[in-house]
Amino acid sequence: MSALTIFTESEATTPVWYSMDAAEMAEKLGSKGVRFERWQADRDLGDNPDPETVIGAYQHAIDRLVAEKGYQSWDVISMRADNPQKEALRSKFLSEHTHGEDEVRFFVEGAGLFCLHLDGHIFQVLCEKNDLISVPAGTPHWFDMGSSPHFTAIRIFDNQEGWIAKFTGDPIADGYPRLP
């Protein structure tokens, strides 16, 4: 189940706030400019849907977001435990970084942990099926897909070139809980 855990940036073992309630999560994250919402497909996706089927099932929600925010492109990414690059990709995503654009992800299946470094706190957002998160441009963050990743997500971009990271060099991510 989706969850938000908040730590101070100086204490990585004891949370100062925790909730699994989507409305509470959306309110707490929204106060920091982070969008969190739940989407539903407009059809059954079946087993192992292709990217076109995934996009089609959520096109209504994508169109609403594009109309509101002016995003330019979207795609589907899937990661599985048998991916030969999983360790290198996990390591890269675990380094704190920022983007010059919003990082928008919608989880079609599976899970991932977004960790946001905001105002002296670390907001760990466990995103699961039907969760959308939009991390504002310039927000220091990292992402953990776990040691045996399993997720499919829709990525939505401001920039036609897609995901461009600027790594901060801050090792803070090393001290916080990760997915198994």
From Swiss-Prot:
It catalyses: 1,2-dihydroxy-5-(methylsulfanyl)pent-1-en-3-one + O2 = 3-(methylsulfanyl)propanoate + CO + formate + 2 H(+); 1,2-dihydroxy-5-(methylsulfanyl)pent-1-en-3-one + O2 = 4-methylsulfanyl-2-oxobutanoate + formate + 2 H(+). GO terms for biological process: L-methionine salvage from methylthioadenosine; L-methionine salvage from S-adenosylmethionine. Its cofactor is Fe(2+); Ni(2+). The gene is mtnD. Ni(2+) binds at H97, H99, E103, H141. Keywords: Amino-acid biosynthesis, Dioxygenase, Iron, Metal-binding, Methionine biosynthesis, Nickel, Oxidoreductase. Binds 1 Fe(2+) cation per monomer. This is Acireductone dioxygenase. It comes from Erwinia tasmaniensis (strain DSM 17950 / CFBP 7177 / CIP 109463 / NCPPB 4357 / Et1/99). Fe(2+) binds at H97, H99, E103, H141.
